[in-house]
Amino acid sequence: MDLGICKRCGEFEGSCECGKGEVLLKSEDRKKVSKFLSGLLRHFGRDFGVRLDEDGWAELRDVLKILSERYGVGRKHVELIVKFDPKGRFELKNGRIRAKYGHSVEVRTDWSEGGEIPEKLYHATSPENLNSILKTGLLPMRRREVHMCSSPQEAIEVGKRHSSNPVLLEIDAKGLMQDGIEVRRKGKVYTVDFVPPKFIRVLSFDPRSPNPAKGY
């Protein structure tokens, strides 16, 4: 959806109520900028001269310089992207910006925004990975943490980036924590260093059902 600002309605996503707001980022441009910003803060910042500290923070001015040259956007555009990001991927604070999760570069990941952790979480994977996961557990692979979602629908949506028919897994988050494994909340995503096989259950998924996730 578009992002913009209105003197009457304030910042908005999609359209403002009065219909007189100014669109600052069209939907297509928003996708391009947020995708590049995500990569910059998670994977390839060094290639553009952006330095991340041990907690993943970068100086906002350095990021804005690159985004301005590449896409012609400024601070307000970035603020809107951060505010309305559907998964809460980014954080702005004291003139710095970071991605909360998803890094392939080395940053400290043992922090959490706190709050209640659901007893059950969900992760979707390609069918060809299933046997290995059930034997050895869920590993971060190319990322530094395993990512989990609070709903089956969200997990399937993420899983479809890698497979047209992902397998849905239910994670016993309560069991993980009782076993001393820390589960962290970062934005709308939950992360963990590793999920042992005993905390994983394979689910079927029917989005048309009022109870779409069923174990088997």
From Swiss-Prot:
GO terms, molecular function: NAD+ poly-ADP-ribosyltransferase activity; tRNA 2'-phosphotransferase activity
Pfam families: PTS_2-RNA
Keyword Transcription regulation carried by entry: no
UniProtKB keywords: NAD, Transferase
One BP term from GO: tRNA splicing, via endonucleolytic cleavage and ligation
Documented EC number(s): 2.7.1.-
Keyword Metal-binding tagged: no
EC supergroup of this enzyme: transferase
InterPro entries associated with the record: Ptrans_KptA/Tpt1, RNA_2'-PTrans_C, RNA_2'-PTrans_KptA, RNA_2'-PTrans_N
Family: Belongs to the KptA/TPT1 family.
Biological role stated in the UniProt entry: Removes the 2'-phosphate from RNA via an intermediate in which the phosphate is ADP-ribosylated by NAD followed by a presumed transesterification to release the RNA and generate ADP-ribose 1''-2''-cyclic phosphate (APPR>P). May function as an ADP-ribosylase.
The protein, known as: Probable RNA 2'-phosphotransferase 2
Species in which this protein is naturally found: Archaeoglobus fulgidus (strain ATCC 49558 / DSM 4304 / JCM 9628 / NBRC 100126 / VC-16)
